[in-house]
Amino acid sequence: QLEEQTINFAEAMEEGRTSKFAKELRKILNARGLKDTGVIVSNDILSTTVLKEQDGQIAFDPRITRATTEEGAVEGEYDKNTDIIFLSLNAVNPDGNATDAEIQTRLNKILDHEMIHALRAKDLITENEYRYLKNLVKNRRVPQAVDAQAFEQKETFYTRSKRINSGLAKLGASANKVEEIYIEEAIAELFRTREV
């Protein structure tokens, strides 16, 4: 059962592009060479993955990005179909008590993660660089400040990625595709937490 569309999609997209948070993130993308990649900050992820066809109409279905009993809400997503990074305010500030500075810091870290997916999709990471990063995430242990459980279990960024993304195998992708996702997610998390 799809949710009834309760938002004005075009309006939400425009607000997501022009919010004070998005403007700060835009500066980061520009500085990192991703001037053509869009960024939208909204309550929910508004990417093509949450749009479904129902009875010949396009419907908004945020169920796959919202928090469940097993998993937290999706914080961000790079949509390669539209070349836009979508970030969720509901995921970074679920109780509504964070200050603007705290929200911006959280969004910046998520942007760092999602930028890796954009760089990879645009083939802006060379094979040598990717091979280096792949080896790095398979050998670098996760710091305690990033994930206490991963630290206790002496996980690398790669083994942590396999654990926290274990549901990927059920989606029907080939073993090679799932492995690539594990590696790319590990690299994205390494970049996100590089200052820890």
Ranges and model annotations:
Residues 5-196:
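Active-site-flanking segments in enzyme catalytic domains
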Residues 1-2:
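Intrinsically disordered, low-structural-confidence terminal and linker regions
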